[in-house]
């Protein structure tokens, strides 16, 4: 089954999908194709816990029930900087601006679906 993932590092977010049977190392290969950093310079995390390269995504807890298209699971990403890995850091998403008045629902006293019957 497919799992849907949101790989996050600082302000970078990658949306991807993979098979539950894919390994963590294979997921690092996907990241390498996008961010041009080899797997040995990457660490992937689930809830601040380092993921083992040899385990499958399913063994790490990513299943089609927990990582759905409409609610992808979050995977943290850290890169090697010189001889050590950076600390895992994920910036929170920004808040959307307030809706303009013209887009806010209008309370006209009746349902928008009601029509006058003649």
From Swiss-Prot:
PROSITE patterns attached to this UniProt entry: UBIQUITIN_2 (PS50053)
Q: Name one Pfam family in it.
A: ubiquitin
Compartments (UniProt record): Nucleus
GO biological process assignments: protein ubiquitination; target-directed miRNA degradation; transcription elongation by RNA polymerase II; transcription initiation at RNA polymerase II promoter
Record's SUPFAM superfamilies?
A: Ubiquitin-like
Name the residue ranges with Polar residues bias: 108-118
Q: Which residues carry this modification: Phosphoserine?
A: 108, 111
InterPro entries given in the database record:
ELOB, Ubiquitin-like_dom, Ubiquitin-like_domsf
Tagged with keyword Phosphoprotein: yes
UniProt keywords (A-Z) are: Acetylation, Nucleus, Phosphoprotein, Transcription, Transcription regulation, Ubl conjugation pathway
Q: Which residues carry this modification: N-acetylmethionine?
A: 1
GO cellular component terms listed in the entry, alphabetical order: Cul2-RING ubiquitin ligase complex; Cul5-RING ubiquitin ligase complex; cytosol; elongin complex; VCB complex
* Residue span of region Disordered: 91-118
Q: Domain Ubiquitin-like: where?
A: 1-79
Q: Which residues carry this modification: Phosphothreonine?
A: 84
Q: What is its main location?
A: nucleus
- Domain of life of the source: Eukaryota
GO MF annotation list: transcription corepressor binding; ubiquitin protein ligase binding
- What pathway does the UniProt record associate with this protein? Protein modification; protein ubiquitination
Tell me how this protein assembles. Answer: Heterotrimer of an A (ELOA, ELOA2 or ELOA3P), ELOB and ELOC subunit. The elongin BC complex interacts with EPOP; leading to recruit the elongin BC complex to Polycomb group (PcG) target genes, thereby restricting excessive activity of the PRC2/EED-EZH2 complex.
The family note in this entry says: Belongs to the Elongin B family.
Report the protein's function.
SIII, also known as elongin, is a general transcription elongation factor that increases the RNA polymerase II transcription elongation past template-encoded arresting sites. Subunit A is transcriptionally active and its transcription activity is strongly enhanced by binding to the dimeric complex of the SIII regulatory subunits B and C (elongin BC complex). Core component of multiple cullin-2 and cullin-5-RING E3 ubiquitin-protein ligase complexes (ECS complexes), which mediate the ubiquitination of target proteins. By binding to BC-box motifs it seems to link target recruitment subunits, like VHL and members of the SOCS box family, to Cullin/RBX1 modules that activate E2 ubiquitination enzymes. Component the von Hippel-Lindau ubiquitination complex CBC(VHL).
> How is this protein named in the record?
Elongin-B
